[in-house]
Design a protein with these regions (language model features):
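Residues forming anionic-ligand binding surfaces in small-molecule and nucleic-acid pockets
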Residues: 1-11, 42-52
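Short beta-strand elements
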Residues: 1, 99-107
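A glycine-rich phosphate-binding loop feature that marks nucleotide/adenosyl-phosphate handling sites
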Residues: 43-50, 89-97, 146-160
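Conserved small/polar residues in nucleotide/adenosyl-binding loops
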Residues: 161-167
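The substrate-binding groove and active-site-proximal loops of carbohydrate-active enzymes
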Residues: 58-62
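Structural beta-strand/beta-sheet cores of well-ordered domains, especially the beta-sheet scaffolds
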Residues: 34-36, 48-52, 80-82, 97-101
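Carboxylate/His-rich catalytic cores and anion/metal-binding grooves
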Residues: 1, 9-35
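Catalytic or ion-translocation cores adjacent to nucleophile or general acid/base/metal-coordination motifs
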Residues: 15, 32, 65-86, 93-95, ...
Length: 168
């Protein structure tokens, strides 16, 4: 394989196959019934890999949504005669499933504490909050490592939430 080996633009920029589109439609309908809305779905880089991104929610709700999504993906895949692989690295050298949550910090009035200002004066708040986050990561690095250390994370770089389906 070349250095990255996954420059499969024909898949990434291609249209979603009809069988997969039908599956994704049914997944969306099931998720709506459960109160989970997805805003993005498209092909991903690896063969037969697709992304589904839920709409932003509070952290505890977003984590629950991710669990519901994974269960729904597998259930609906079976109904369509498909197999949904959610492993971080199902095959050597090929992207796998990256399940993660993004986070932000806002005040009660809706001010985004991680929004860089447009002027040096407005940027002070962002720099202070960022410095505090970096200090916390430094002080609690052992706890962060323990919370993320598992065999799956040993074999994957940072990635995004993916759905992997067969190509046929």
């Amino acid at each position: 394989m070349p250095p990255k080996g996954q420059e499969l633009d024909d898949h990434y920029f291609g249209t979603i196959r009809q069988r997969v589109a039908s599956y994704m439609k049914d997944v969306n309908e099931e998720l709506w019934k459960l109160g989970v809305a997805a805003k993005t779905q498209h092909n991903e880089v690896a063969p037969a890999q697709h992304e589904l991104a839920p709409i932003y929610a509070e952290a505890n709700i977003a984590v629950d949504h991710n669990q519901i999504i994974m269960k729904t993906l597998k259930k609906v895949a079976c109904e369509h005669g498909l197999k949904c692989l959610l492993h971080e690295k199902p095959f050597a050298g090929v992207n796998g499933s990256g399940k993660h949550n993004n986070w932000s910090i806002t005040t009660d009035d809706g001010i985004n504490m991680l929004d860089p200002g447009k002027t040096p004066h407005e940027n002070v708040q962002f720099l202070l909050v960022l410095a505090c986050i970096l200090k916390a990561v430094d002080v609690h690095a052992d706890l962060l490592r323990e919370s993320a250390a598992d065999p799956g994370n040993d074999h994957r770089p940072v990635s995004y939430t993916h759905l992997t389906l067969p190509t046929n």
